[in-house]
Curated annotation (Swiss-Prot):
The keyword Transmembrane helix applies. Gene3D superfamilies: 1.20.1170.10. The keyword Transmembrane applies. GO terms for molecular function: toxin activity. It is found in: Secreted; Host cell membrane. Composed of a binding component, B, and two lytic components, L1 and L2. All three subunits act synergically to cause hemolysis. Residues 1-31 form the signal peptide. GO terms for cellular component: extracellular region; host cell plasma membrane; membrane. This is Hemolysin BL-binding component. Keywords: Cytolysis, Enterotoxin, Hemolysis, Host cell membrane, Host membrane, Membrane, Secreted, Signal, Toxin, Transmembrane, Transmembrane helix, Virulence.
Length: 375
């Protein structure tokens, strides 16, 4: 029997996504009388390059969601005090509700969806731990020709893979629901924002010049956020000293983001009731709109990851079939074909674990703050 793991695995709810299949590792040949097996049928690890790219996308998505949600909460309440909206008596109420909806989505991200995303990273960490605990026993089983122990180990690992695939799909469904809900609200918010600007301009408010200034500041925020992401991309390259260059880029980006905060604070100050109202509504709309766009990329990435979990499940099923076939042979070395892939998988999961842990800590840094509900 295979040696059981000396610790209690996390609850099934933490065994989520983020692994892929189709690793490229050396093709091993069966010992005497054993037919040659295609290496793709016996892979036990993820495609490391694709996995790193997927982890990176997940981290950048979470960082963007944190930032835009934070700005939604920090943005002042919409206030129509002292402003008359003739002919559209329900518009103030609609826009107040738009802001409430946007903040509710930010809270959903922070209290529910972000936790599920963190659990996807926990899933890869825990899978590496499980694989590591099974490794020595499976190597011994290969060396002694113990097919039953090998099958039990692969079957146990496959069970965790299936759980990860299942919960990956649930996360995709949750993100899709959030995207659809936000998409509906963004369209309504955008329509109400445009109508408000038209009304304010007709009342003589100089919102055009201020709107241009607002867009410049928000554009700068997005630019430096992208620059910071580019620096992260460079650091992930990890070749020819590029991590140092990437670190400089990230440092510059963070400095500039810090300098932009006073500009955002300036835009939040009351100058003229009508202009200030336009600013507050514009900032709220801009952030919820950016969240809407970020969700599309996240769903695409997670769909890819879910598919790869499914493919990895198929790979392990194939490995079980090869073990069954090899077990019919009399040679004690009949399972040696698995050892190169077992060794490659051990190293690969360890590398991916490191990336997953790093991203987990980064994602947890920012908590969306509560806001006093509007009356």
């Amino acid at each position: 029997m295979i040696k059981k793991i000396p610790y209690k695995l996390l609850a099934v709810s933490t065994l989520l996504t983020i692994t892929t299949a189709n690793v490229v590792s050396p093709v091993a040949t069966f010992a005497s009388e054993i037919e040659q097996t295609n290496n793709g049928d016996t892979a036990l690890s993820a495609n490391e390059a694709k996995m790193k790219e997927t982890l990176q996308k997940a981290g950048l998505f979470a960082k963007s969601m944190n930032a835009y949600s934070y700005m939604l909460i920090k943005n002042p309440d919409v206030n129509f005090e002292g402003i008359t909206i003739n002919g559209y008596v329900d518009l103030p109420g609609r826009i107040v509700q738009d802001q409430k909806n946007a903040r509710a989505h930010a809270v959903t991200w922070d209290t529910k969806v972000k936790k599920q995303l963190l659990d996807t990273l926990t899933g890869i960490v825990e899978y590496d731990t499980t694989f590591d605990n099974y490794y020595e026993t499976m190597v011994e089983a290969i060396n002694t020709g113990d097919g039953e122990t090998l099958k039990e180990g692969i079957t146990d690992l496959r069970g965790e893979i299936q759980q990860n695939q299942k919960y990956a799909q649930q996360l995709i469904e949750e993100l899709t629901k959030l995207r659809d809900s936000i998409g509906h609200d963004v369209r309504a918010f955008g329509s109400n924002k445009e109508l408000l600007q038209s009304i304010l301009k007709n009342q003589g408010a100089d919102v055009d010049a201020d709107q241009k200034r607002l867009e410049e500041v928000l554009g700068s925020v997005n630019y430096y956020k992208q620059l910071e992401s580019d620096g992260f991309n460079v650091m992930k390259g990890a070749i020819l000293g590029l991590p140092i260059i990437g670190g400089i880029i990230v440092g510059v980006a963070r400095d500039n983001l810090g300098k932009l905060e006073p500009l955002l604070a300036e835009l939040r100050q009351t100058v003229d009731y009508k202009v200030t109202l336009n600013r507050v509504v514009g900032v709220a709309y801009s952030n919820i709109n950016e969240i809407d766009k970020a969700l599309d990329d996240a769903i695409n990435a997670l769909t890819y990851m879910s598919t790869q979990w499914h493919d990895l499940d198929s790979q392990y099923s194939g490995v079980l079939g090869h073990i069954e076939n090899a077990a019919q042979k009399a040679d004690q070395n009949k399972f040696k074909f698995l050892k190169p892939n077992l060794n490659a998988a051990k190293d690969s999961w360890k590398t991916l674990r490191t990336d997953a842990v790093t991203l987990k800590e980064g994602i947890k840094e920012l908590k969306v703050e509560t806001v006093t509900p509007q009356k």
